[in-house]
Amino acid sequence: QSLPLVYTGQEFGYDHSFAFFDRDPLPACEPNETTEFYRRLIALRHDAPALASGERGGSFVEIRNNAEDCLLTFVRETPENRVVALLNVSPYEVHADFDTGIYAGGYADALTGERVQLCSHVDERMPGWSFRILTRPM
């Protein structure tokens, strides 16, 4: 039920390592593609009840897949909404092959808003570090 942290400067694409307990100054940065990406992820986290922390959020349900060392596929769901995440957490292209079962159906891409269909069987190639986050009201 935990969430990833955004470390200082990540939202600007800054890749310098800061001392953990020291407050390093962050150089001036202009908003960019990375900033917009983080804004959308943070907005999704606030707008999707399924992604709330603790008991308020949806339970984590793993969707079993053929490449569990590289693919993270899961659902979080509340009575208000459902979020389905398909993530290739490796630098390698991976052949994703798995059934989505009861989670198949129409969704919105959480970052673009594009309407998409999640088929009952996924059989596709996912480039390294690629992902899809899908959401829909219940």
Predicted regions and their residues:
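Carbohydrate-interacting/catalytic domains
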Residues: 1-138
